[in-house]
């Protein structure tokens, strides 16, 4: 008689993976979680808010996964998956509450899947949110052996009168950039076109490991800033680089004037540019060392930079806002 295992689906391996994943997920639980993993749905109690607005986001890791396949490294992309979601909802002042993941593969290997969820768990702990559920799909014949995809979904909350939507942005506001940890999770199709050997040396490390450096999670730093300062707008620098993402914080007609020499560009970007990419295209593709941008009053800028650095991240005054137009001007 034919079995599910004959078709390429190993139910026992799935049970093993779930058992391992549950341990990592449980480490993330906050007081809002009101049921255990294994139910048909995750539940989260919302209390302590006057007029709460739920803020949601979903994202994946893109073709950065291809490098993870080659390097046989699974945990860091789990952090990436969380970071891409929580940093997006953070732009509106939302505190992440809970997260769900989706993992799909051709052949499930429990230990590797658990490593991936360990990374998701680490990311959730860093962001202060709970991993309350997920789906692991074994799909034989759909993915090549050793390959998988991962996506995430998060929900956060902000008081209605505290939503940051760019409506307070004014002419003359200062733009502060917080450092990235590297390329983060965008632009990897171009990276993979230019770099073929991920074992080659780059400043004493395998370049594949450098490229797999996890996306920085800005949640703790930014939520503390919001308590102390009036933040007019925020942008997570992802696909499309400076040109696409900074204008997303503007409600009206404004131009972001960016001073290119005002912040440190990590060596990995200079290396990519040396392989034949024009500087303008770099800023339209990558974060170039700035993963998150704040728009603030000029009189608050220096204090905010000092506070960010006290929290452990480098920050720079990278430019300012000018009335008129709608885009980015690099100088």
From Swiss-Prot:
Disulfide bonds: none annotated. Keywords: ATP-binding, Cytoplasm, Ligase, Nucleotide-binding, Purine biosynthesis. Pfam families: AIRS (PF00586), AIRS_C (PF02769). Pathway: Purine metabolism; IMP biosynthesis via de novo pathway; 5-amino-1-(5-phospho-D-ribosyl)imidazole from N(2)-formyl-N(1)-(5-phospho-D-ribosyl)glycinamide: step 2/2. GO terms for cellular component: cytosol. Its EC number is 6.3.3.1. One of its GO terms (biological process) is adenine biosynthetic process. Its main location: cytoplasm. Coiled coil: none annotated. It catalyses: 2-formamido-N(1)-(5-O-phospho-beta-D-ribosyl)acetamidine + ATP = 5-amino-1-(5-phospho-beta-D-ribosyl)imidazole + ADP + phosphate + H(+). InterPro entries: PurM-like_C_dom, PurM-like_C_sf, PurM-like_N, PurM-like_N_sf, PurM_cligase. GO terms for molecular function: ATP binding; phosphoribosylamine-glycine ligase activity; phosphoribosylformylglycinamidine cyclo-ligase activity. Belongs to the AIR synthase family. HAMAP family: AIRS. This is Phosphoribosylformylglycinamidine cyclo-ligase. It comes from Clostridium novyi (strain NT). The gene is purM.
